[in-house]
Amino acid sequence: FALFFCSLALALTPDMAAKNHATYYKKKLPFICTPTLTLNDILNVGDTLVYRYAIKHARKQEIRRLEEKELLEFIEAIKKENLRTACKDKEILNMLSIGVTLDELFYSENGELIFEYTIEDRDCKKLQ
């Protein structure tokens, strides 16, 4: 019984897991994900991790010049790759399974929000 109780006492709550993750990885930022995508910040807000990315382009106005259909395709490609990467990470999967959610925010180089979405446990389960 004592061993069981100790293992429960050490179990992380979603808030604690998010805080520990953000504290650890914040020290490694900024992180260049691809030549056009940089992770600039990770914040924990309760049981939510907020990831702030900057999208860089050769021409700063390139995003604004995309037709709506092209912009939606661009966003969908980033979301698909980002979800695939998150759902392969064991630490992320463990956090999602205990109730942590990931808010993914994507900004232009001048700080304008381009799009955002949330990753939850069920999103990764759909990929399996």
List PLM regions with ranges:
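Sec-dependent signal peptide recognition
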Residues: F1-F4
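N-terminal signal peptide c-region/cleavage motif recognized by signal peptidases
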Residues: C6-A9
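N-proximal, solvent-exposed amphipathic alpha-helical segments enriched in charged/polar residues
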Residues: A11-T48, K56-A58
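Short, intrinsically disordered, charge-biased short linear motifs at domain edges
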Residues: A18-N20, E70-A77, E109-I114
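Extracellular/lumenal and peripheral-membrane lipid-interaction modules
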Residues: L29, C33, E73-K79, S97, ...
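Polar/charged, Gly/Pro-rich intrinsically disordered segments
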Residues: P35-T38, V45, V50-K60, I92-Q128
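Mature extracytoplasmic domains of secretory-pathway proteins
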Residues: N44-L93
